[in-house]
Amino acid sequence: MTFKTKQNSDPRVIVPKPNRMRQLSRQGFGWLDARLHKHAWLSILTPDQIAAYTFLCLVANPQGVSWYRKDRIRAAMCIDEHALRQALYKLYDLDLVAYKPFSRHASDGFHQVLSLPTDGPAIP
């Protein structure tokens, strides 16, 4: 049985539960860019890096900015400080996330999920 809706105009696609189709929520803005998969970004990221990126995407405001402190991120992700630090540094290095401390000597700050570069990652 095929269900045709505005969101599903391809008759070859079967939506198993049409009453449960995802929609953007007014309560949050989190989303992931499909190019993470299409341009092979996921293939170069570790599970901790993917988890950190996903978390930041989900808690970001419309400008992509999150101000969660690292201890709250670690608690939400159930990882230790070293693992989070390594994951974030890789995301900064790949230019997927930018960081600005709350103040000059603060250890916490603003994380911004950046628009994806036009090309995929440089894979060695």
Residue ranges with predicted function:
Residues 51-55:
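Pre-recognition alpha-helix immediately N-terminal to the DNA-recognition helix
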